[in-house]
Amino acid sequence: MMLDVAPPRFRVEEEDERHGIFVAEPLPRGLGHTLGNALRRVMLSGLPGAAVTKLRIEGVQHEFSTIEGVREDVVDIILNVKQLKFRLERDEPIELQISKDGPGEVRGSDIELKADVEVVNPDAYIASLSEGGHLDMTLTVERGQGYVPAEQNKSDADPIGVIAVDSLFSPVEKVQYRVSETRAGARVDLDALTLEVFTDGRLGPREALREASRKLIDFFGLFAEGYQGAGAAEEPGRSGGRPVITDERPIEDLELTVRSYNCLKREGVDTIGQLATMTEEELMNIRNLGMKSVDEIRSKLEEYGYTLESGRE
């Protein structure tokens, strides 16, 4: 299909920290929609980011509480906290503190930061304190991808007063694409694909497009002849024992919940191949990884043709 088409060109029409317009042309007719839709979907739901997953406020037992000297009730504070955007350069969860006395407003800039973490929107409003008011709050920030409801962020190990919140990890706010006609030489039936990407500042638009492209390349590699990234192979001369699985795809491709993903990363489990060689008992021995998470991992592995006990079926 590509033999009689000039090599496609990529160009940047507009770009700043949060917005970019990118064009690829000429493409064979129909391929513009194929690529545009795939890239759009991956950018919106398949890229990792960092967000608040839990919070704890001194003196508060549950989310339907009020705090003396604070204008907002806890429900409103949670809604405001969910708007905070973070860059986190570590796989492990991190706890951040806010401690402020009134009168005055509490904003993202009042968060006491640690190494490897940054608040992208420090002007984000959290609460207002009156004279004598005080807010002492701990935020748990984790990496993940897509949208994770509060229920999945809960843990039986959480002490009383820890409130799980909905987390929107995706750094991409909106993606639009359009396909127009273009020409190359005598050919006039070709596609020009224009992608417009809006991010929230945690990731630049060109970087978002690049990361989405890499993810798609990894998945399309499954169907390419001679692809070596997936499948199980037994070591030469080895009989019995645990199989060696050479699936180098990252565990991010499994789209696990935040808890399962972070527990595995802390244990150094980075690829699907590593995970597929593990047993249920080994997973249960990982700190904070309960039976619910093990069941989730088993289900995800089965979608890829693996079992916990014996690797590829």
Swiss-Prot record:
Xref: Pfam families: RNA_pol_A_bac (PF01000), RNA_pol_A_CTD (PF03118), RNA_pol_L (PF01193)
Catalytic activity: RNA(n) + a ribonucleoside 5'-triphosphate = RNA(n+1) + diphosphate
Family annotation (SMART domains): RPOLD
Enzyme class: transferase
E.C. designation(s): 2.7.7.6
Gene Ontology CC terms: cytoplasm; DNA-directed RNA polymerase complex
Record region (Alpha C-terminal domain (alpha-CTD)): 242-313
A GO term for molecular function: protein dimerization activity
Annotated GO biological process: DNA-templated transcription
Entry keyword set: DNA-directed RNA polymerase, Nucleotidyltransferase, Transcription, Transferase
Keyword set includes Transferase: yes
Region of interest (Alpha N-terminal domain (alpha-NTD)), residue spans: 1-227
Assembly information from the UniProt record: Homodimer. The RNAP catalytic core consists of 2 alpha, 1 beta, 1 beta' and 1 omega subunit. When a sigma factor is associated with the core the holoenzyme is formed, which can initiate transcription.
Domain topic, free-text comment: The N-terminal domain is essential for RNAP assembly and basal transcription, whereas the C-terminal domain is involved in interaction with transcriptional regulators and with upstream promoter elements.
Family to which the UniProt record says this protein belongs: Belongs to the RNA polymerase alpha chain family.
Function: DNA-dependent RNA polymerase catalyzes the transcription of DNA into RNA using the four ribonucleoside triphosphates as substrates.
Official protein name in the record: DNA-directed RNA polymerase subunit alpha
Native source species: Rubrobacter xylanophilus (strain DSM 9941 / JCM 11954 / NBRC 16129 / PRD-1)
